[in-house]
Amino acid sequence: MTFLPLKSPLKFYAVVPTADWVERMVEAGADTVQLRCKALHGDELKREIARCVAACQGSHTQLFINDHWREAIEAGAYGVHLGQEDMDTADLAAIAAAGLRLGLSTHSVAELDRALSVHPSYIASGAIFPTTTKQMPTAPQGLDKLREYVKQAGGTPVVAIGGIDLNNARAVLATGVSSLAAVRAVTKAANPEAVVKAFQALWDG
């Protein structure tokens, strides 16, 4: 099983909770956005995902849907992002057959090995620094471990996530990761659009 490669580098990767936020990120020119929506179910969730897909059409923003792979396939989303536990329950073959890209979360060498075995479009590694966004199963990985994960991943793009902000972004990029993901650095910012542009400028300088 192999998943399609990314059409373009992920670069700055905003993780947001609603379609409203996805629309804002597209308007701000974000390279990549993930809908991580835990509050909606059923038809409401389907409508939310459909809004996200519509918002990204005609833009360069790559859209990933967290967890909800069936709805993502139905809506024609660009990709799906799954956690380690989701690998046991999601129909990975169906996701691949539908032509969706796949990203997988990893928190250790063993999880990275497992993720790489299904040839995903990218892997996410974290949490790099302490984070209050979600309860993490492992201690923060730190930059030295992240550097090793990048080597282990070989040609598979690595997204760093967890406690990343504009103060530490350059140090994280220096490990060789191809993308920086941010949650609170965007959603809690006074001016999220300016934060997006500041992150994306890291790849231009």
Swiss-Prot record:
Pfam families: TMP-TENI. Its cofactor is Mg(2+). Its EC number is 2.5.1.3. Pathway: Cofactor biosynthesis; thiamine diphosphate biosynthesis; thiamine phosphate from 4-amino-2-methyl-5-diphosphomethylpyrimidine and 4-methyl-5-(2-phosphoethyl)-thiazole: step 1/1. GO terms for molecular function: magnesium ion binding; thiamine-phosphate diphosphorylase activity. NCBIfam families: PRK03512.1 (NF002904), thiE (TIGR00693). Belongs to the thiamine-phosphate synthase family. This is Thiamine-phosphate synthase.
